[in-house]
Amino acid sequence: MFSADDFLGDDPRREFERLLVTRCRAGGAFALMLVDLDGFNDVSARVGAPTADLLLYEVASRLREMLSEHDAVMRSGNGEFAIFVRGMERVQNAERLANELIERVERPLTVSGTRFRLSASIGITLSPRQSGEWRLLLQDADEAVYDAKKQGRGHISISSAPPKR
């Protein structure tokens, strides 16, 4: 599990990249899922940073509940999370998990006395089936989440990067 200090650290993107490098070097199959909370910047601007941080923490907790102890959820930006799922080799399994994660995010939650309904878009890439180089994996997942967001709220897109040779 994670603590509030770990979650709300000064540079979550650096921690995220460090974990991605470590996972790539370790080898083995895993899924990288980038979860982007739809419209979160607007929500954050409306409610202020303290409430937005509590919202992010609650969403991260919900995501973590869906994973095993060998998997990881990290904040990768404002309203963005990276999820590493160890042993995930099949696109169908990754897609099924992503749908469950979206359903979990969409459940109403109350923070600081206000009820929120959020949605998320998810981009997925698999390693080592696609690319074992962390920057390429991140690029693939970024492109996939961008494609998901173009489809509208609550969508999933899977990287179409060519298989690793």
Predicted regions and their residues:
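A structural signal for short, well-ordered beta-strand segments
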Residues: L32, F81, A120-I124
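Residue-level recognition of strand-loop junctions within catalytic nucleotide-signaling folds
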Residues: A45, F84-E89, E106, S127-P128
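Core hydrophobic beta-sheet residues of small sensory/regulatory alpha/beta domains
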Residues: L32-L34, I158
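Cyclic nucleotide signaling catalytic output domains
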Residues: V73, E100, T114-R115, S121-R129, ...
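Short catalytic/binding micro-motifs of nucleotide second-messenger systems
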Residues: E65-H70, E103-R115, D147
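Conserved long alpha-helical elements within nucleotide-processing catalytic cores of c-di-GMP signaling
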Residues: F2-A31, D38-R64, M74-N78, A82, ...
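Conserved catalytic/ATP-binding subdomain
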Residues: R14, G132-R135
